[in-house]
Amino acid sequence: MRIIPAIDIIEGKCVRLSKGDYATKKIYNEDPLEVAKSFEAHGIEYLHLVDLDGAKSSHIVNHKILETIANKTSLKIDFGGGLKTDKDLQIAFESGASQITGGSIAVKNSDVFQNWIQKFGNKKIILGADAKDRKIAVSGWLEDSNEEIIPFIQNYEEKGVKYVICTDISKDGMLEGPSFELYKEILSETKNINLIASGGISEFDELPKLAELGCEGVIIGKAIYENRISLKQFENYILNQ
């Protein structure tokens, strides 16, 4: 199972939110590159980079930070937040993203999202399925949709989606443990999805449980920044896989 630390960006700084609420913003580091380099120094190969300014304004904003991290580390970066147009994707990929995550766009403009899958391939386009009470939330989680999470993912699997990041918003940033039951259900109701668990990771012992369920990756944010899990623990986990 891949270990994927998260860096969320607001105004160029590394922050975390609780349950996606921008009012709960806490700045952890002024320099996202420094954070990314510390991940790489501990054997981590992947990074989930979220442009929260972009998510709010519905277009790419913090691509210069993406470019800096891509140029100065070897991390494979999945970039998301406010990606709405082919131009946004072009900027993201040219700035060094290995993959992009589309969330709101997959709900609000499925034709565009499907076109991205055709154009760039399903290894580069990740479906962001962010759920609040089992309904998909959009626009930086500021709006709810009527899309139920399981049919939503099943529908996109039929359309060729391979990678899905699923965040249970009620868990995100709360350090109360992930949504094991939800992930178990998604994996039992889909055929070949590479499911990346996100939200609520609070301690190291949760990782083997997610791997056992069949999650292909796990995104960890606040547990790192609040020192609940050390980078050394990740390093050992990666070495022993």
Swiss-Prot record:
Report the domain of life of the source organism.
Bacteria
- Tell me the SUPFAM superfamilies matching this sequence: Ribulose-phoshate binding barrel
- Which reaction equations make up its catalytic activity? 1-(5-phospho-beta-D-ribosyl)-5-[(5-phospho-beta-D-ribosylamino)methylideneamino]imidazole-4-carboxamide = 5-[(5-phospho-1-deoxy-D-ribulos-1-ylimino)methylamino]-1-(5-phospho-beta-D-ribosyl)imidazole-4-carboxamide
Q: CDD domains recorded for this chain? A: HisA
EC annotation?
5.3.1.16
GO biological process, alphabetically ordered: L-histidine biosynthetic process; L-tryptophan biosynthetic process
Q: Which GO terms describe its molecular function?
A: 1-(5-phosphoribosyl)-5-[(5-phosphoribosylamino)methylideneamino]imidazole-4-carboxamide isomerase activity
Associated pathway: Amino-acid biosynthesis; L-histidine biosynthesis; L-histidine from 5-phospho-alpha-D-ribose 1-diphosphate: step 4/9
The record's subcellular location field reads: Cytoplasm
Keywords in UniProt for this one?
Amino-acid biosynthesis, Cytoplasm, Histidine biosynthesis, Isomerase
* One GO cellular component term noted in the UniProt record for this chain: cytoplasm
HAMAP family this protein is in? Answer: HisA
Q: Which NCBIfam families match?
A: 1-(5-phosphoribosyl)-5-[(5-phosphoribosylamino)methylideneamino]imidazole-4-carboxamide isomerase
Known PANTHER family for this protein? 1-(5-PHOSPHORIBOSYL)-5-[(5-PHOSPHORIBOSYLAMINO)METHYLIDENEAMINO] IMIDAZOLE-4-CARBOXAMIDE ISOMERASE
Membership in a protein family = Belongs to the HisA/HisF family.
- Please identify the protein, giving its name as recorded: 1-(5-phosphoribosyl)-5-[(5-phosphoribosylamino)methylideneamino] imidazole-4-carboxamide isomerase
